[in-house]
Amino acid sequence: MPQEPMPISQIAIVVKDIHAAMDAYQKALGWGPWNVYEHKPPSLHHTELHGEPTDYTMIGAETHVGPIVVELIQPGEGPSIYKEWLETKGEGLHHIACMAHTQ
């Protein structure tokens, strides 16, 4: 029997300039207002890149588009999955999160 589709809860986009991206999404799609935050050690901890410990910083911004959280991520200092993504693939979709069904 087919399982019900898992609903999308979050879409994360890696960007070079978070303020320019917030402005562009606001103007083009009406997304906002944005809640901006900075993640850095020590609150950002137990982070790894390719199985090795790493410390990094990032700036994030979130807004709701209906039931979906749209998150923009601007890499900061230190090696991270977000900085690597930006350097190798450029700006764009990084991940989509879904709500898992519970039994």
Spans of model-derived segments:
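Vicinal oxygen chelate
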Residues: V15-A20, G32-P33, Y37, V65-V69, ...
